């Protein structure tokens, strides 16, 4: 988990997530650095929009409350269902990417 936390810390500080930066954060925290994990983390996060991933990770709580809201017209329901299906597909893709990260850290 320390590796992911290091990446999140770098991201929140506005720093680039590179092998050297991740190593520096881990070393500053007193963690024994595993070069393979650092390389795998940086490679896995390449092209990932971290802000979007964080936002979507927090989304299921908000989505669960949505069905309790007012009833929608049938046409609106069809649009919402299509939108929800698209969102679910995106979530599945992100979950697969996150699972790939989980495999790296055992």
UniProtKB/Swiss-Prot annotation:
Keywords: Ribonucleoprotein, Ribosomal protein. GO terms for molecular function: structural constituent of ribosome. The keyword Transferase does not apply. GO terms for cellular component: ribonucleoprotein complex; ribosome. CDD domains: Ribosomal_L12p. InterPro entries: P1/P2_N_sf, Ribosomal_P1/P2, Ribosomal_P1_arc. Residues 69-106 are annotated as: Disordered. HAMAP family: Ribosomal_L12_arch. Belongs to the eukaryotic ribosomal protein P1/P2 family. This is Large ribosomal subunit protein P1. It comes from Archaeoglobus fulgidus (strain ATCC 49558 / DSM 4304 / JCM 9628 / NBRC 100126 / VC-16). The gene is rpl12.
């Amino acid at each position: 988990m320390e590796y992911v936390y290091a990446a999140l810390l770098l991201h929140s500080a506005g720093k680039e997530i590179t092998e050297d930066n991740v190593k520096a954060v881990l070393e500053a925290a007193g963690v024994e650095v595993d070069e393979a994990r650092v390389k795998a983390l940086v490679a896995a996060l390449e092209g990932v929009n971290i802000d979007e991933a964080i936002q979507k990770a927090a989304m299921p709580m908000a989505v669960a409350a949505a069905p309790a809201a007012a009833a929608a017209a049938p046409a609106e329901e069809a649009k919402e269902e299509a939108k929800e299906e698209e969102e679910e597909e995106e979530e599945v893709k992100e979950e697969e990417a996150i699972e790939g990260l989980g495999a790296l850290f055992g």
